[in-house]
């Protein structure tokens, strides 16, 4: 069995409405994070910019998860798409959000082995 050591980073960047960043993050951690962990994702960072909770403006939250190797990424992605609770979470929290974006990244040194699936 091949051991997959490459780290794939799942980066959620969310801009909640003014004054809503802390409430959004609390809800994300309570409702989204447990299911993400069940799908094999490991939480590595929760960043807030600027580094204070704003009341009259929007913060930007960057939440970074990881999985090990392409098979874990595909499994996580497949499970998330088939779970109506994931879509339901994002639909329910939409009123708190100005924008959100998810991206996936890896180390350049891992690209060749990640592409060898």
Regions found by a protein language model. Give the residues of each.
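Short, solvent-exposed loop/turn elements at beta->coil junctions and helix N-caps
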Residues: 47-53
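Active-site-flanking beta-strand signature of metal-NTP-handling nucleotidyl enzymes
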Residues: 8-14, 62
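Acidic/histidine-enriched, glycine/proline-rich intrinsically disordered or flexible terminal extensions
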Residues: 105-117
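Basic/polar N-terminal segments that are highly enriched at the extreme N-terminus
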Residues: 1-5, 116-117
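Short, surface-exposed ligand-recognition loops at beta-strand->loop->(often short) alpha-helix junctions
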Residues: 16-24
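Short amphipathic
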Residues: 11-13, 103-107
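An amphipathic, aromatic/His-enriched active-site/gating alpha helix that lines ligand/cofactor pockets
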Residues: 2-4, 26-45, 56-57, 66-105
């Amino acid at each position: 069995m091949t051991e997959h050591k490459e780290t794939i980073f799942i980066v959620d960047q969310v801009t909640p409405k003014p004054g809503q960043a802390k409430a959004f993050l609390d809800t994300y951690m309570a409702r989204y994070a447990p299911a993400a962990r069940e799908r094999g994702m490991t939480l590595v960072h929760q960043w807030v910019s600027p580094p204070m909770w704003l009341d009259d403006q929007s913060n930007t939250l960057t939440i970074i998860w990881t999985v090990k190797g392409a098979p874990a990424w595909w499994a996580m992605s497949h499970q998330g798409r088939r779970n109506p609770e994931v879509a339901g979470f994002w639909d329910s929290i939409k009123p708190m959000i100005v924008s959100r974006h998810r991206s996936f990244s890896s180390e350049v040194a891992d690209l060749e082995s990640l592409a060898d699936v």
